[in-house]
UniProtKB/Swiss-Prot annotation:
Listed pathway(s): Amino-acid biosynthesis; L-histidine biosynthesis; L-histidine from 5-phospho-alpha-D-ribose 1-diphosphate: step 4/9
Protein's organism: Brevibacillus brevis (strain 47 / JCM 6285 / NBRC 100599)
Protein family membership: Belongs to the HisA/HisF family.
Protein name, as recorded: 1-(5-phosphoribosyl)-5-[(5-phosphoribosylamino)methylideneamino] imidazole-4-carboxamide isomerase
GO molecular function: 1-(5-phosphoribosyl)-5-[(5-phosphoribosylamino)methylideneamino]imidazole-4-carboxamide isomerase activity
Length: 249
């Protein structure tokens, strides 16, 4: 199975930013134009771009949708979008605007009838965002931690038609401490579905370690801070992934 590197663009107040461990009080602005940043990642070889509406995640409804739709229309690679998407109308709006995959987090945990419906209608275009703290799912922009075990929830959602999960380890997001490879691989094996890793990637070796679990279903990694702080470039990451595949093949 191929392994996709997703450069992340987190949007707050119309700008490209990064938060530390999801803390809205610890923000770094990296670019005034998310669209220019998306084009930059495409120029460097991105095959997908990962977009997050941080204002939307906090407010519970899309807040930077116009910018996100413009990016989806303007770049030649697919985009996946998360942040504040909690209704069928919002999902349809993004899909009609050219977004390839919509990430649903809070609503998937809090409203299972809704989740059942959207997975039955658009399962291949939906990713379930599992944002976790110590293996428990967090919701509402990471402000609330539930008592729901990520693996148990994921297995239940697979019965409704879930095909793709995005696993974020909140304690590692933006910290550059390395991803939680064990939990990510365990989730992929427990569900038999595609799991994209998010949070903590700090060096190329982290990507290579995750990619060794591609055959288990770990299908990619979302990378943010490591790219923005020049820990490595997207081009370097993609070259290493290609080298891994030709070596493995």
């Amino acid at each position: 199975m191929s392994f996709i590197v997703y450069p992340a663009i987190d949007i707050r107040g119309g700008k490209c930013v990064r938060l530390f461990q999801g803390d809205y009080g610890q923000e770094t602005v990296y670019a005034d134009s998310p669209l220019a940043m998306a084009k930059r990642w495409v120029e460097q070889g991105a095959s997908w771009v990962h977009l997050v509406d941080l204002d939307g995640a906090k407010e519970g409804k899309p807040a930077n949708a116009a910018i996100i739709k413009e990016i989806a229309r303007s770049i030649p690679v697919p985009v996946q979008v998360g942040g504040g998407i909690r209704t069928e109308e919002q999902i349809a709006d993004y899909l009609e605007a050219g977004v390839a995959r919509v990430i649903v987090g809070t609503a998937a945990i809090e409203d299972e009838p809704f989740t059942k419906r959207i997975l039955q209608n658009d399962g291949d275009k939906i990713a379930i965002g599992l944002d976790c703290r110590n293996g428990l799912v967090a919701t509402r922009g990471w402000l609330t931690t539930t008592d729901v075990q990520a693996t148990e929830l994921a297995k239940r959602l697979v019965t409704y038609g879930a095909e793709t999960f995005i696993y974020t380890d909140i304690a590692r997001d933006g910290t550059m401490t390395g991803p939680n490879v064990e939990e990510i691989a365990a989730l992929a094996m427990a569900t038999g579905k595609s799991v994209i890793a998010s949070g903590g990637v700090s060096q190329l070796d982290d990507l290579l370690t995750l990619a060794t679990h591609a055959s288990d279903g770990v299908s990619g990694a979302i990378v943010g801070k490591a790219l923005y702080t020049d820990a490595f470039t997207l081009e370097e990451a993609l070259q290493r992934m290609e080298g891994r595949e030709s070596y493995a093949g």
